[in-house]
Amino acid sequence: MKFSSLAAATALVAGSVVAADLDPIVIKVGVRSALIPGWPKGGSKFFYKSNGTEFFMKGIAYQQEFSTNGTSSDKNNYQDPLADVESCRRDIPLMQQLQTNTIRVYAIDPKKDHKQCMKLLQDAGIYVVADLSEPSTSIIRDDPKWDDVLYTRYTSVVDELAQYSNVIGFFAGNEVSNNSTNTDASAFVKAAVRDMKAYIKQKNYRSMGVGYATNDDAEIRKDMTAYFNCNKQEESIDFWGYNIYSWCGDSSYTESGYDKVVEEFKTFNVPVFFAEYGCNEVQPRKFTEVQALYGDKMTPVVSGGIVYMYFQEENDYGLVKIEGGKPKKLPDFNSLQKQISKIKPSGVQMDSYKPTNTALSTCPKSSTWKASVKLPPTPNKDLCSCMVKSLSCVAKPSVTGKELGKLFGTVCGSDKDACKGITADATSGTYGAYSMCSPSEKLSFAFNQYYQHQSAKGNGANACDFGGAATAQKSEKPSGSCANLVDQAGQDGTGSVTSAPGSGGNKPDQGAASTISAPSVNLGIVKLGAYIFCAVLAGAGMILI
């Protein structure tokens, strides 16, 4: 729904190829500690790595507004705040006036150069928490998927930001499931959490957390929290961001429900912080919640928060208005500055911290929670490429957009068995091995399955056409690592592929990604099941049966 930020600290004298490194922030995380190299054992707090002082986020969401909350968007013209050096030079001094030690950015372009802005942030003692998605490449709540395109986007952001010591971690999703009608989408986000954690470990990057930012929906809040922190450590979040706007004007600890937040998370085993906060129903905002957030009742449980947001936009949440390239402080800025200057959060030292909350949560089983504990498979480009090369009938490269959706409806409506290997059902936890491939690759698999089934009946002569959308190709018999991958997937694509991406058919190391099932099928328009249903009603039997 909105944006947020993370934490800051003291700079080390030690140099780096990019800039003088800030003291990394580490997480004391109980059951996770044994599996995350470099992270101390036990607990649910952020600490400065060198001196062990507890770290509380005093953050600001820093990005021009766009939607990253699980809704569809074709926009790709977002502004990367970490690549705009002049804006960084202009804005960071104002952030320092608010004692900012963390910013949250919602979308960066991994192809751009971020060295100068990250250097300016490091020099100012400011850390970064970055969302992995961008407006046109994110997990959509009403048509979720976890595929090659998303995997490539997410890993490219990790690759780009891993070089900076002032990056605390990443959000794999922001308010994707936001009510009881779309909880199944959380399975795809949790698969992204699992795979990014495994990727960071596989690349031998320094310790960086992968978390999720949730909205404050009373109906699904508890189930959501439990789901992202249950079953297996390697697929559970490393920190939990809470977008909360319940404290408006001169509210109170109890009236706002902050007391319930503390009660709910007092035994949680990973750090919790407000990923967005700052109700604007009363203006100018008074930010009196700052005293509660950093006071003695909340700091034992909540590790600070991120104010939404720096820039003044149409939504009227801004601290600063940019006019003619120059910043103008708004009344909200002055209110926040006044409140933040009063706080002195008291924490604990890492060495003396004795956590008792180390267990994972129990997975939700309520009637309103539809996401299975069985997650979509890890995207595997090698598997998809090997599969397409092995086919005799494939989709033409010219088939795109809405035509893809219609063709899925046609082939799956005519032969449901042809689509078993590409469908994904996050409620039942059933995923085809190729459900994480690109739409074109999935359509090629379905076309070929239909063609093979018709050929077995003696009807193959015209079965690879689909109105000119399909074409025959000379198939390649899989060999070597390709043979291993395709064999694991099975002839109909319903097998379980246990090879990690790029591993050439080898199983992942212990503690890396969990058994690969297969991410969801997103056709980009409507879910595949709906296409099948509509195609059957429309009489897709015009094709040979």
Swiss-Prot record:
SMART domains: X8 (SM00768). InterPro entries: Glucanosyltransferase (IPR004886), Glycoside_hydrolase_SF (IPR017853), X8 (IPR012946). Keywords: Cell membrane, Cell wall, Cell wall biogenesis/degradation, Disulfide bond, Glycoprotein, GPI-anchor, Lipoprotein, Membrane, Secreted, Signal, Transferase. GO terms for biological process: fungal-type cell wall (1->3)-beta-D-glucan biosynthetic process; fungal-type cell wall organization. Its EC number is 2.4.1.-. Residues 1-19 form the signal peptide. This is 1,3-beta-glucanosyltransferase ARB_07487.
